[in-house]
Amino acid sequence: DGGQAQFIERSVPTDYESDRLGPLLDHMRKHLHQEHRIPDLARRAGMSERTFLRRFSEATGKTPAKWLLNVRLCEARDHLETSDISIERIAEHTGFGTPTNLRHHFREQMGTTPTAYRQTFGRISA
């Protein structure tokens, strides 16, 4: 582990306030626990699916799925560092659904398990 937290880039679109995607990104962040399907996101943004995918990628540098995974991982990491919420609840709250899914994606991105990360970087003794 080395005792150093791994960096997860926090994707922020260019011209966030003026961009039509800003409110949509806020909505997605506030509803991480929900499924976000491309047709629904495009409709919410008032765009065709093709235009939505192009604009989303231009604004964030990622596909919606990769952006959402990144945001979910950042939120999970924040919970692990600052709370004693169970891994199960973190998985539900951040949209991973199950602890197994959270562990898989967390290990893939961070190189460690959520439990080991919490033991190393957590600020609250669980």
Functional labels for PLM-detected ranges:
Residues 51, 100-101:
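Residues in the helix-turn-helix
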Residues 26, 35-40, 47, 57-99, ...:
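Terminal helix-turn-helix DNA-binding modules in bacterial transcription factors
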Residues 62-64, 111-114:
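Short, solvent-exposed alpha-helical "recognition" segments
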Residues 10-11:
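Anionic-ligand binding region
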Residues 1-7, 16, 20-37, 56, ...:
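Basic, amphipathic alpha-helical hairpins
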Residues 4, 42, 51-54, 91:
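Short acidic/polar alpha-helix capping motifs at helix-coil junctions
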Residues 2-6, 66, 116:
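Short, polar/charged, Gly/Pro-enriched helix-capping and turn/loop motifs at alpha-helix termini
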